[in-house]
């Protein structure tokens, strides 16, 4: 489970779509399941507790990138549930570390 903190324009198709899928799973854990169940104690889940507004904004950034690339988005999040902080300031890996991780994957991400 990973929600990157890198600007979505730098993600390859594979990672952009995967993050979108993971973000929806995370959103459901935190909203529908009230932070309970399978991945509720995962570090990626825990860093978004109290930051649904920031998670919503990340989703919207992904959707804007979808639009730029001509992808069709059909899974909006309920904005009414986007509460809490609009800023994510907890990182599992720093931005620099995330770029290294993506470079090591030898994918088509555009990280410099």
Please give the residue ranges for each predicted region.
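Expand to "…catalyze enediolate/carbanion chemistry for C-C bond making/breaking, isomerization
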Residues: 1-112
């Amino acid at each position: 489970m990973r929600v990157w903190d890198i600007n979505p324009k730098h993600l390859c198709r594979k990672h952009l779509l995967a993050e979108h899928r993971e973000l929806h799973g995370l959103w459901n854990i935190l909203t529908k399941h009230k932070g309970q169940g399978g991945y509720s104690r995962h570090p990626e889940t825990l860093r978004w507790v109290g930051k649904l507004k920031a998670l919503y904004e990340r989703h919207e950034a992904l959707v804007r990138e979808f639009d730029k690339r001509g992808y069709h988005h059909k899974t909006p999040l309920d904005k009414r549930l986007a509460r809490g902080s609009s800023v994510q300031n907890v990182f599992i890996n720093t931005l620099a570390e995330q770029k290294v991780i993506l470079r090591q994957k030898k994918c088509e991400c555009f990280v410099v």
